[in-house]
């Protein structure tokens, strides 16, 4: 089961994968039941997991939170995100206008 997929809760990279998943579900209403959207479902799951791990690792225990999670660092990217960057669909690090402040 996927977590809440609201755009304000995730980085721009994961939001892009969520958009691809939702587009697949709308284009293939029957196909989503037989696994046609499994690639994007798995990619979203991996990305949200990496976000959670990144938040956990960068959450200071006794200090005020300073880090803003707007863009997922490349070392936390999933294989799907790396493939999208190679294909030129994802441009990393340039846009800081989306995502959520922790």
From Swiss-Prot:
Disulfide bonds join 14-47, 24-37. Residues 11-55 form the CHCH domain. The keyword Mitochondrion applies. GO terms for cellular component: mitochondrion. It is found in: Mitochondrion. Pfam families: Cmc1. It comes from the Eukaryota. A motif (Cx9C motif 2) lies at residues 37-47. Keywords: Disulfide bond, Mitochondrion. A motif (Cx9C motif 1) lies at residues 14-24. Its main location: mitochondrion. May be involved in cytochrome c oxidase biogenesis. Belongs to the CMC family. This is COX assembly mitochondrial protein 2 homolog. It comes from Caenorhabditis elegans.
């Amino acid at each position: 089961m996927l977590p809440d997929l609201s755009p304000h809760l995730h980085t721009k990279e994961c939001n892009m994968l969520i958009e691809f998943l939702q587009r697949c579900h709308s284009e293939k209403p029957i196909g989503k039941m037989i696994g046609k959207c499994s690639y994007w479902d798995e990619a979203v799951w991996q990305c949200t997991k990496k976000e959670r791990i990144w938040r956990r690792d960068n959450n200071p225990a006794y200090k005020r939170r300073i880090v803003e999670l707007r863009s997922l660092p490349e070392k936390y990217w999933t294989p799907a995100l790396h493939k999208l960057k190679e294909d030129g669909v994802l441009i990393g690090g340039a846009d800081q206008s989306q995502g959520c402040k922790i």
